[in-house]
Regions:
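Flexible acidic/His/Gly-enriched loops in nucleotide-sugar-dependent glycosyltransferase catalytic domains
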Residues: 53, 63-74, 93, 97-155
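Short beta-strand-to-loop acidic/aromatic patch adjacent to the donor-nucleotide binding site
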Residues: 80-91
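Short acidic donor-binding/metal-coordinating loop in glycosyltransferase active sites
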Residues: 62, 87-89, 117, 169
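Cell-envelope/extracellular polymer assembly enzymes that use nucleotide-activated donors
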Residues: 2-5, 32, 172
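Short, well-formed alpha-helical segments that are part of the catalytic scaffolds
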Residues: 12-25
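C-terminal subregions of glycosyltransferases and related glycan-biosynthesis enzymes
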Residues: 26, 172, 179, 192-290
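Conserved nucleotide-sugar donor-binding catalytic segment
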Residues: 131-204
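Acidic donor-binding segment of Leloir-type glycosyltransferases
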Residues: 24-59
């Protein structure tokens, strides 16, 4: 069975305990857990220690060493073939880990898998979905934040080694670098409730994976708001400029549609404000290039 390393930030001990409890019920599914801690205290170690008899779990203390936090996590997940950066907003369904493993085994040439969290619950009305249901509602075709991506670790290692200066301080940039350098073709797999349905259109893959990873760069962040000390307008402006850089041929309407889809699922990003900030950012960029 494929081994997946789930990397969890130790931001809130109650949330950490709940997430580890969910994973402990799937201990025979073939995975291990890495708790990433920046607090400098023993709290996360104590919580993780309570689950060591149920599953493979360890805690890594992150440092201000100049390396991106995600890279420190990746180094600590030594030997892991697949990694999933699991943010606290994501709740695992009972069969999700096994389903991911089966999809990876069935499609060995793919490097990135999308884990469609909402699919098992489409039969439930919104108000009666099980407690702890993933708190963001996606329309058909929408894509979850990076925490629903399972990524081949070697893709990240090779991309970082090829151009560490271009990696920035977040995972979105290094994945973008992996696409540009052609180290591997980041393939896409939607893990659905039923049979997996590969999406092989390169243009669709390029747009969806890179745009949404670029968005994550300016959203909540893996380790929380303290890593992104910007108000909503500043984040939206940065996001707009990032999208314009990645996709110079995109029209304003295309970019606005992308931004509005994110505004639906991200609390601070309200549609009208998002659209107006994006329009202003793109206008400023066009003027600077004129």
């Amino acid at each position: 069975m494929i081994e997946i390393c789930f990397i969890i930030p130790a931001r809130n001990m109650d949330t950490l305990h709940r997430t580890l409890s969910m994973l402990s019920f799937q201990k025979d599914a073939g995975f291990r857990v890495l708790v990433a801690d920046r607090s400098g205290t023993e709290a996360a170690h104590d919580v993780a220690a309570g689950f060591e008899h149920q599953m493979t779990v360890e805690t890594v203390d992150l440092e201000n060493s100049g390396l991106p936090l995600w890279k420190q996590c990746l180094d600590a997940a030594r030997g892991a073939e697949w990694v999933c950066f699991l943010t606290p907003q994501v709740d695992l369904t009972p069969s999700s880990v096994r389903r991911m493993s089966r999809c990876i085994e069935d499609h060995p040439s793919y490097d990135i898998f999308h884990w469609n969290l909402t699919a098992p619950y489409r039969k439930y009305p919104l108000k009666t979905r099980p407690a702890g249901f993933f708190r963001r509602v996606f329309r058909e075709g929408d894509v979850a934040p990076i925490s629903s991506f399972v990524i081949r670790a070697q893709v990240l290692r090779e991309a970082f080694a090829a151009d560490p200066d271009a990696a920035g301080m977040d995972l979105a940039v290094i994945l973008s670098a992996a696409r540009k350098t052609g180290i591997r073709s980041a393939r896409w797999e939607r893990i659905s409730y039923n049979a997996p349905a590969p999406v092989d259109d390169p243009a669709w893959v390029e747009k969806d994976v890179r745009a949404r990873l670029a968005f994550f760069r300016w959203s909540e962040g893996f380790f929380g708001e303290e890593d992104y000390p910007l108000d909503t307008g500043e984040r939206l402006t940065l996001y707009a400029n990032e999208l314009a850089r990645l996709y110079p041929s995109f029209t304003y309407e295309e970019l606005k549609a992308d931004l509005n889809s994110f505004a639906v699922v991200s609390g601070p990003f309200r549609k009208m404000r998002a659209a107006s900030v994006l329009k202003a950012a793109l206008k400023a960029r066009q003027e600077s290039l004129a």
